[in-house]
């Protein structure tokens, strides 16, 4: 591992921790030339996952692209970086757990939508407005009505059980 500060190839591992879910390893490293300390993360390299887009083209699954879409949706919301990482990990694990090596972009959108709907309603609306390509205000209103109806149903169910 090269030092990101001076480029030296000789670094040593100071500390190693496995993530809570066991899917990655965090290592603290120190450069043996300049003593710069930095963190690296290791995760298993999955068999190549492909994404079939709406226009029929196929491209490699891009974890960073998924993360960027989620980060745009949760921007200026009370959602931590750790939560975003966990959401990305969950979606990626779900996709990798499927037999098919080619998944549709709509499946990815549905998985993210489901997670955001329970996490943060505003982030959910932001995400689905892009994912479903809303072009009219009525589309926002329909989605908001669905979210509010679901919340009302949940509220009524919790009050009737008391």
UniProtKB/Swiss-Prot annotation:
Keywords: ATP-binding, DNA-binding, Metal-binding, Nucleotide-binding, Plasmid, Repressor, Transcription, Transcription regulation, Zinc, Zinc-finger. A zinc finger (unnamed) spans 3-34. Binds 1 zinc ion. Negatively regulates transcription of bacterial ribonucleotide reductase nrd genes and operons by binding to NrdR-boxes. Belongs to the NrdR family. HAMAP family: NrdR. This is Transcriptional repressor NrdR. The lineage of its organism: Archaea, Methanobacteriati, Methanobacteriota, Stenosarchaea group, Halobacteria.
